[in-house]
Amino acid sequence: MAEPRTLVLLRHGNSDWNQKNLFTGWVDVELSEQGVAEGQRAGELLAESGILPDVLHTSVLIRAIDTANIALKRAGRSWIPVQRTWRLNERHYGALQGKDKAQTLAEYGPEQFATWRRSFDVPPPPIDDDDEYSQSRDPRYADLGDALPRTECLKDVIERMLPYWESDIQPDLASGRTVLVTAHGNSLRALVKHLDGISDADIAELNIPTGIPLVYRLDEDYRPIVPGGEYLDPEAAAAGAAAVAAQGSKK
């Protein structure tokens, strides 16, 4: 039997807008002090477990890039090769980007709020190109043209993420490398949905906490040996996932 392939998923640390309870999406916001500490702890968990990444795949958003750099430095792996892609970006929240989650919940009600936030195939209203939180003039997306999202649902995230999973991440796993993917709540939910075969309905209940490595051992067909993977700090992961689920209720 072939050796299991090791995939480590890491959601970026807490960001300034996570702390302010704002919809972030593709807006490029910095880590908070808490997020920096989470990145450091993630690196310590990797080092303590002996799960040392050989290659990093991350989004082009600074909160994921910085989390990965902080974690890898703490784990003594700053030198590994890196690939960055917009396909691992957070879900684009459209016209909700920059809006307060609690205010949005109060304004539109729990049903509409839940639909925009957790529906598999219903995106929020699209963002205008001249909105201050639009990416229409961001140079990192200049080559996307009409493919630049103006809003997304989770289904859209899966459709733009899976080609990269197949073309770039799977080959690294097949070569025997331990792969670290540092990304975002929804791009990681999209990948976990694919790995674990989670239904369109059940994925709404999955929450991924910030800053805690989630380790998957995959067989030769890229199926999880342990469904759901294993967090390197299960207790902190459970508390973090509960905090993510409660977003919107905070003032």
From Swiss-Prot:
Pathway named in the protein's UniProt entry: Carbohydrate degradation; glycolysis; pyruvate from D-glyceraldehyde 3-phosphate: step 3/5
Gene3D superfamilies xrefs: Phosphoglycerate mutase-like
UniProt keyword list: Gluconeogenesis, Glycolysis, Isomerase
Positions annotated as active site in the UniProt record: H12, E90
InterPro entries: His_Pase_superF_clade-1, His_PPase_superfam, Phosphogly_mut1
Site (Transition state stabilizer): H184
Pfam family, one: His_Phos_1
Stretches for region Disordered: 117-142
CDD domains: HP_PGM_like
A biological process term (GO) from this entry: glycolytic process
Keyword Isomerase applies: yes
Coiled-coil residue spans: none
Enzyme nomenclature, EC number: 5.4.2.11
Role summary: Catalyzes the interconversion of 2-phosphoglycerate and 3-phosphoglycerate.
Family to which the UniProt record says this protein belongs: Belongs to the phosphoglycerate mutase family. BPG-dependent PGAM subfamily.
Name of the protein this chain belongs to: 2,3-bisphosphoglycerate-dependent phosphoglycerate mutase
Organism placement in taxonomy: Bacteria, Bacillati, Actinomycetota, Actinomycetes, Micrococcales
